Amino acid sequence: NSVYRLKEIVKVLAYYGFGFIVDSKLNGNKKSPENLRKAFEELGPTFIKIGQILSTRPDLLPLPYIKELSKLQNNVPPENFIDIENLFFEELSSTIDNTFLYFDKTPIGSASIAQVHDAILKDGRFVIVKIQRPGIAEMMKTDLSIIKKLLNITKTKFTDALIDPKEAIDELFISTTQELDFINEINNIKKFKKLNEDVKFVRTPYTIDKLCTEKIIVMEKIVGIKIDNLKKLLNEGYDLEELGKKLTLSYFKQVFQDGFFHGDPHPGNLLIRENHICYIDFGIMGTISKSLKISLNDAILAVAYHDVNKMISVIMSIGVKKGYVNRNSLYESIEYLFDNYISVSLKNIKISVMLQEIFQISKNNNIKLPKELTMLLKSTLMIEGVIARISPELSIVDVLIPYVKSQNQNLFFRNFDFDNLLLNGFKFVKSSSEFPSKFVELSESIIRGRAKIQLQHNNLQKPIKDLNRMVNRMVFAIIISSMIIGSSLILRTNIGPKLHDISIIGISGFMIAALMGFYLLISILRSGTL
């Protein structure tokens, strides 16, 4: 089966112009984002899920590919119901009929990893049942193993930066493993519910824990209006602008306060019921560490005040250097970005677009930003799209900046630690007391000539190498010229041993000079710098 699947993958990738991933000789001319999406669709559920995961990672793929892979749909035919029944029994040692009062055999949703059914518990509660496709875990692991082997044996160098193969496959293994274990999603639901229990306008479904396993989730069914069904919302008397503000504040709380946010907030996962915003589907969640939250706060303030140095400081502190970083170039790029936004009204600034530009600037300057920010970028893009639809006049930046400013004020008092203050104060006083002696020591070193200045050069190896080559050729040419002149003088005076009354030393000098000249000419021609 693995051999057959390998042949199928190679055939489809080559047909759509991506054979170079397997063999550099198969570099077709049909390579495009659209063709990559078509190839993934043809290769089935595993590759659809891979494409969906990759669409959340702009740090791994160029933006045109991200946009195209985001179009991948989960329109996968449902599984045979007998297979669903067998999996249910294997997981819970009980039949569907014995567990539920009613169970709809036709799924209301059929995705690449799982399908969802309506059901009613014995106690009358309406629930939805998410059941993993039988054998999908093994299929996905097999496909990923095949891809990993292909990338290991190929000699392709990915010079067009389409994808970082090793990192992409590692990320895919992690992401698919997490999504295939439904316990992770159950924990996500509980954590999200706990963090938002004090938010009066947010509602999260509860789970039926005794019926949940690694492959099955049974949770409360929330019947509501899709957030983009504007006509129905207006008929029900909802204020769309108020809904937009509530959604914005809810999202900012998740990001800047909780550090745990919904990673897939498209309209299908946002329902409105009884003045509550109801979040569903917690398979994809984003997390942000405490230090990264603080850096994000600083970045937003840098945008608000057009503080280039502060933004550079944030980028350098959270990013990982992948090569030489030219701070002057970085400064100019950020300054140019801010200058473009100075004349733009805050309401017209899109956070997602600015994030994309900061990602690109960082990448151009050999800085890799944390992967946590890629999920934030995608979810922010979705939230902006939803808000633009339900409340076009609302600018999330107008809400964001005051929110972050107030959070920073509260953060100072909330995180105030008297012990740390004393410790840092002691360190400051200790360092300050050493300053006079250090200054005197430095002054004496300068006066007595012991001071040393260390200079570090960057990227000068090639110019130095070229200079050495040039000097060597000049020396070589001078030696050849000297030998020609010397040999001419010897022949003119005709001194030394002779052959046919011609000086052997003079002739030998000319021959050696000719060989050296020929060697010099060949080396110049090979270098292509004639």
Curated annotation (Swiss-Prot):
Record-linked InterPro entries? ABC1_dom (IPR004147), Kinase-like_dom_sf (IPR011009), UbiB_kinase (IPR050154)
Q: Which Pfam families match?
A: ABC1 (PF03109)
Which family does the record assign?
A: Belongs to the protein kinase superfamily. ADCK protein kinase family.
What is the official name of this protein in its record? Uncharacterized protein in hydrogenase 1 5'region
- State the organism of origin: Clostridium pasteurianum
